[in-house]
């Protein structure tokens, strides 16, 4: 069995390690030719996960043609949401090589230009490929260390989804199926912004009670947007790994880049400097603008999310933002 992963960052590399350890051949694509060559030569991704060994059945390449073929069990995309349209277009141009191959998307967030979630972007472009979302509480380093996580595969085709789970689920990647593909992505997008808020509260030393308050209020904001977008709610999604589980993980540890980013803000670091240094790594900073635009379009209020937006982009004071978050 062969699987291709597009995105040779921390998460893509960790998924490759977890799959290859269970006998799956993995093609790992990344833009940086020097890095992919180094992976093949030294069996380490020095750029992103330098301390972890990559098994020999992982082949890295910067040539996208090498990873798009009709004998892939699936193609997994582990790239930032704002780059997803470009990559999907490249796949679409190679449809003769991978038509009907399932696409599993790990991207989290909302596209700035269209206000679309990752699955909506992919479905717009890749009309012949079954689209799934793979999401849940899953730090790359823990996956690379073969520690277990529970994640969700969401998509419309239940039979195909469950078949994929049988093939790729293992003692590290414990995967369950959901049909609620939009609900899963709402939780994945909002949790990063809520984690920034939790980091700010922790950085200001306002206590664990206040952090718990933000998590609780944040869960309500996920539910609010969920109902507005989906016109219904699936409790299995809301209290499952992709919403509640990912929210708890992202909001309660400094290993979360979004929480750590908020922590530095709470400690008084310059916000613009932090954004400049972390824009590509902290998903919440790129998600908050389109999220607020989507909330306005759907006529819903998300107090925590608008507070973070105003803090990052409208120059309100930190104390005012904290007051709004906790009010």
Swiss-Prot record:
One GO MF term: glycerol-3-phosphate dehydrogenase [NAD(P)+] activity
Source organism: Ehrlichia ruminantium (strain Welgevonden)
Gene3D superfamilies, A to Z: N-(1-d-carboxylethyl)-l-norvaline Dehydrogenase, domain 2, NAD(P)-binding Rossmann-like Domain
Binding site for NADPH: 10-11, 31, 108, 140, 257, 281, 283
HAMAP family in UniProt: NAD_Glyc3P_dehydrog (MF_00394)
GO cellular component annotations of the record: cytosol
GO BP: carbohydrate metabolic process; glycerol-3-phosphate biosynthetic process; glycerol-3-phosphate catabolic process; glycerophospholipid metabolic process; phospholipid biosynthetic process
Annotated PANTHER family: GLYCEROL-3-PHOSPHATE DEHYDROGENASE, GLYCEROL-3-PHOSPHATE DEHYDROGENASE [NAD(+)] 2, CHLOROPLASTIC
Binding site for sn-glycerol 3-phosphate: 108, 136, 138, 191, 246, 256-258
Protein name (database record): Glycerol-3-phosphate dehydrogenase [NAD(P)+]
Gene label: gpsA
